[in-house]
Amino acid sequence: KKAEDAIEKVTVNEIQLTRDGEENYSYAVFDRGDTDDKRKRDKGKRKRTRIYWAKDSKKFASIRSDQRKSKELWVVHSVKNKRPKLETYKYDMAGDKNVTQYEIDIHDLATQSILKLDIKKFKDQRIGVYSGRQFRYPDSDKPQQTVWLAEDSKKLYFYRQSRDMHKVDVCVA
């Protein structure tokens, strides 16, 4: 009971960090596994994002995926449902000309500014941010916070990988 009362007393001050949201050009983690019906029901709900915090919490990095030109894939869920349900999502297949493009942004909380990293090297590359390992109790309801690998907010370690997976660069920004 005390914990519930404490949660209700917490004041949350939300700050909108971006104003450039667009369907299929997202900061959110992919929501594969949801049927189209469920996706429509949950349209206004918040989605998990790919955010990596600096250990000093002064900055965070986000990965944004641009799938506006990617083609859709359809999956029919027919096993556990009385009637088949459709799941539609963007998926890059071998040979596709238009595939997901990725960006890394660094958000500075003190200045409320966003630095878009110039990371382009390989055509249709994949990217990722190196993060530290975190222990998490399976029954914990605490939000998961991914922390980037560097000791402070002055450096960010990331990788870029060619689409054919033959080349990988380890980078620092």
Please describe what each predicted stretch is.
Residues 24-34, 123-143:
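Extracytoplasmic beta-rich repeat domains
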Residues 61-64, 147, 162:
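Catalytic cores of secreted or luminal carbohydrate-active enzymes
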Residues 45-46, 50-59, 131, 140-141, ...:
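Blade-terminus and WD-like Trp-Asp/Gly-His loop motifs, strongest in beta-propeller folds
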